[in-house]
Amino acid sequence: MTALNNNKETSINPMIIMDKAIDMSTRLSGSQFPVSIFPAKIQRIIKEVHECHSFPTDYISAAILTALAVGIGNTHLAQMKQGWLESPILYMALIGRPGANKSHPLSFAMKPFLDYDYEQNKLFEEQYSKFEEKMCMSRKERIENGEDGFPQEPVRKRFLVSDVTPEGLSYIHAQNKRGLCLWTDELSAWFKNFNRYNNGSEEQFWLSIFSAKTTISDRRSSKSSIFIKRPYISVIGTIQKKILSELAKGERSSNGFIDRILFVMPNLQQKARWSDRELPDNIERDWQAIIQHLIDMECQINEQQEIEPHVLSFTEEAKARLYEWQHHFSEQCDNETNDTIVSIYCKLEIYIIRFCLIIQLARWTCGECDKEAIDLLSVERAIRLTEYFKNSAISVQNILNENMLTAQQQAIVNHLPATFTTAQAHDVAKENDMKPRTLERFLNDNIGVLFRKEKHGEYSKINS
């Protein structure tokens, strides 16, 4: 077993070294997203789209990650252990100022699904027109014309939905059991609608969907219910930095809803400059082919007309590495004093398994590996991706916390250096007319939120 592990480590090390070199190069260009998690074909697509369209690398990478997840949908699951299965469901938010090129990367990544939905809609309209013609006939006339006596109403196949109620979404999902993606240009419209009908019920619907829990929708217009055994709905959209605080209103902070969202917030210092470079013709074709490969995957359907997903377990070395990571991650949770951050960490332990599945299937789609099991390289890449989203979540929490500060408190935070002593904090507080006891309470209340206590009398700012 030791020899096997040694051989595995020897073969994987060059890939890990190459991944780190790629990510270092990406960081030098201003992006923190670990693009090395993707197969070489997708890395090239991201690079070309970034250089030709000036789309921020973080946005295009996150949009592509979500598109891959949607392409997989309910066809594959990751099995961590017996009875513990994870779907590749992602809730993704691209954060930025107006004009930060948030929407265009989404349009690029989702175009293959848009094209598919468009063609399927045309086909549906043709089929529905014929269906209506048949329904205008009597049953006898239909049989005489060689038609089915009781024609089946056609179903519209699709991947994408926009503004829709849980009831409407359940109806669409029942016809598209492979899975859906809620794509909304402004995520604020999504969560502002949570209380539009039944108080809080829509939010509970999305909490259940995240965990792929069975959903039952009782339609007002029918005596029958819509029963979805294992729902798959990913969500992606954009949100402006200045309205982030809207996302944390109500129970969304206390019930863990906000902790389920993956945030992408690149540190864009300048507005993107136009590039006169044209996107090579093959880039869109290559991306279309990758998603089409996922769309074309055959799904096994059982006698109950439910999808039987292909379940991927982990190789022994992959599982060992994932457990090692989780134990280290748990130590971070144990040492964390902020309950909100701990809750975020707990959701990331779920997400990392989903990332492993998406990364393995992306590599398989591009011909870089098989899909018999999730291997060590996919786990290593998922770990780096999880670290990225952990840092993004902490940055978002800091923004939310700073939005709740008084002008006096904000001034003190702004004037404190990245690392400071209690004496330095008192000096800054005195300059801003804050009493010593008030300062000490402010520091203590914000340990793990705005500040980190390094040792007695010494602190550091978390978001510096």
Give residue spans per PLM region:
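Phosphate-handling catalytic cores of nucleic-acid transaction enzymes
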Residues: 2-464
